[in-house]
């Protein structure tokens, strides 16, 4: 899909489908803006008959109004004093999704005077493209409806020289993350994830290292391998490196949880635990690899970025880890496994230690780690923890710019008491109360405390069961845009 602009006299514009945004204010003068496709007086009469006043989220659709236009969709944006970027993005996203089956090209005209920057235009373009996303890989009968190929913005005089190149690159990263998360577990295996990572490296000139089980054993990754040994599929520890040309001013590690399927192990997932959905337990690694794809194309200056994924399955066989086993992580700390379904933090323990040994300035890990965060924050907001106020503030700012909502949670040190073990350095789970906090406290034990760190729990945000805003039902690709924006802000 491509983005384009039409900056010439609108009387010369030609198109089939137009989305037109209006404010909840005097309608007649706003309709004058589209006199190039229809008589404003005729349109005002039709709009008035529908009692449409531009209320936020309300839409009107007109077919074949004029020979110059097949479809006109008018979307209400609400009062100008209440107008915000998120509302515009969600409104346009919902409309694009409704029209993609009918059009190869959609044109958009909005009250651009209320858009404050090129970044906001780019993010609006992101929203339109990501709303139009479809995944038909596993359908026997391919979709024979039209495929949206172009989104055109009309009359962007305020932003004449705008470029959508980075916008497309970021969207490609999000779309990759969505495809990875949505892929069934017999399709996206640890082996396939390593192939996808290697392809990113090949396409964008990244260094790639894939560690096999023996390599991980040599590094002492007893926590990660304890999870992996219950599966007949070999684990793959993935490490991509993106190095900027010229002097490196900062080194960063992005770590993603990579469970391509999580049965729960001997603490088997049952009942409402949604075992059938546990293909998305690699949502963190999908975000990291999606960011690698986008950043590999963007090539930010002055940075060395490491993308790390400890990929495996959590399954049950004769070799699977038992509840009560004690394992040793690669930093030498011992862990009593009191719950085999708290496996993600075990894989992350060794992944974070590996990242820490690279001596980065910052580490950010993303993981579908706990159900507790879903109870706390629902499905629209991801929780995050950080040991550094500057990093936390930068991450919050990036998430706000990217339109992915984060909420900072406390690293409540008193809760570490719940992780104490009588026979090992710690247990892998604490009490039920505060479960997402104790999970973060567990992770904090596996990297140099001098390194700035943030942990993002995306268990509630990596998937949606229904169309919502810019996300069609299914995988959301949550986290890619925030990571990329955080890097771009450097």
UniProtKB/Swiss-Prot annotation:
SUPFAM superfamilies: Macro domain-like (SSF52949), Zn-dependent exopeptidases (SSF53187). Mn(2+) 2 binds at residues 257, 262, 281, 343. One of its GO terms (cellular component) is cytoplasm. Keywords: Aminopeptidase, Cytoplasm, Hydrolase, Manganese, Metal-binding, Protease. It is found in: Cytoplasm. It catalyses: Release of an N-terminal amino acid, Xaa-|-Yaa-, in which Xaa is preferably Leu, but may be other amino acids including Pro although not Arg or Lys, and Yaa may be Pro. Amino acid amides and methyl esters are also readily hydrolyzed, but rates on arylamides are exceedingly low; Release of an N-terminal amino acid, preferentially leucine, but not glutamic or aspartic acids. Mn(2+) 1 binds at residues 262, 341, 343. One of its GO terms (biological process) is proteolysis. Gene3D superfamilies: Leucine Aminopeptidase, subunit E, domain 1, Zn peptidases. Its EC number is 3.4.11.1, 3.4.11.10. Binds 2 manganese ions per subunit. The active site is at 269, 345. PROSITE patterns: CYTOSOL_AP. Belongs to the peptidase M17 family. Presumably involved in the processing and regular turnover of intracellular proteins. Catalyzes the removal of unsubstituted N-terminal amino acids from various peptides. This is Probable cytosol aminopeptidase. The gene is pepA.
